[in-house]
Structure formats: C-alpha cells, structure tokens
Amino acid sequence: MSSEEGKLFVGGLNFNTDERALEDHFSSFGPISEVVVVKDRETQRSRGFGFITFTNPEHASNAMRAMNGESLDGRQIRVDHAGKSARGSRGGAFGSYERGRGYPRGGGDQGYGSGRYDNRPGAYGFGYGYGYGRSRDYGGRSQGGYDRYSGGNYRDNYDN
C-alpha cells in the first residue's frame, strides 16, 4: 500500500487553521501519519490548503465523504483524494478541480518561480493562465497592448 492512497487534499482552509487544528478535526476517522498546511515560502502564511495522510486508505475515504463541504474554523472546506490527476491530461491553466487540482505528488510549496504552470523561459508561473514574463511578454500581448478591453495603448494620453 502506498501512502498516496490514504492522502487527502483539503482546500478552502481558513488562513489561521494550522496542522494541529486540522488533525483535531480529522483524527476521529482513524490514525493519521502526516498533516501539512502548505505555507507561502516567503511570508510563512497559510496558502489555504493542506494535506492529511491516513495510515489506512479506507479511513481517508470515510473522512473525505464526511468532511467534504463541512465548515472548519468558519470556512467551508473541500476534501478530495490528493494526487489523483493525470499529469498530461489537465484541462486549462487550473488543472482539473475535481481530480485534486493538479497539485504535484509529494505536495510541498514550489513557489511562484517554479514554472510549474508556465514553462516558457522568463515566465513566473502563477498558474492563472496569464504568464506574466520578465521582459516584454505580457500574456501573449506586446507591451503596447496594456489594456486589451480599452482598445488603446497605455501610453496614448502621455506620449502625444
């Protein structure tokens, strides 16, 4: 049995929910081998999601069914099996919301500069489909196309 089988993704966490609170809310379903609340690398603040690994996959399934959609520290949480997405078949920039949101196996915070979502050189990899680059690549538009909805150039009013 792989530990991945008993691993759950927990999303929508209150930013003040820590590992101990998460474990307290899930421990009634069975023995837990690991609890991780993913934190921002620079600020050490919660990113609003985490992972819980049960020693028995059946306990994890029971916890998922019981806790998905429940309230924890004032926030409705989403609980799903972790790492279920097929890496090559994620749809769109967000991945598949129903299959673990495409977070990589092993969890952990790869940070904004990891290129996890956008493999182009110079891109920051925010994961939202914008792909802001370090040079003149602004989501596939040139610098002149600052506001695609206005139809104008952001320098129009200043360079005349």
UniProtKB/Swiss-Prot annotation:
Residues 103-114 have a biased composition (Gly residues). The lineage of its organism: Eukaryota, Metazoa, Chordata, Craniata, Vertebrata. Gene3D superfamilies: 3.30.70.330. Residues 6-84 form the RRM domain. The keyword Plastid does not apply. This is RNA-binding protein 3. GO terms for molecular function: ribosomal large subunit binding; RNA binding. Pfam families: RRM_1. InterPro entries: Nucleotide-bd_a/b_plait_sf, RBD_domain_sf, RBM, RBM3/CIRBP_RRM, RRM_dom. The modification Dimethylated arginine is found at R105. The modification Phosphoserine is found at S150. Cold-inducible mRNA binding protein that enhances global protein synthesis at both physiological and mild hypothermic temperatures. Reduces the relative abundance of microRNAs, when overexpressed. Enhances phosphorylation of translation initiation factors and active polysome formation. One of its GO terms (cellular component) is nucleoplasm. CDD domains: RRM_CIRBP_RBM3. Keywords: Cell projection, Cytoplasm, Methylation, Nucleus, Phosphoprotein, RNA-binding, Stress response. GO terms for biological process: cellular response to cold; cold acclimation; positive regulation of translation; regulation of translation; response to cold. Coiled coil: none annotated. It comes from Capra hircus (Goat). Residues 81-116, 135-160 are annotated as: Disordered. Its main location: nucleus. The modification Phosphotyrosine is found at Y158. Interacts with RPL4. Associates with the 60S ribosomal subunits. The modification Omega-N-methylarginine is found at R47, R105, R120, R134. The modification Asymmetric dimethylarginine is found at R105. It is found in: Nucleus; Cytoplasm; Cell projection, Dendrite.
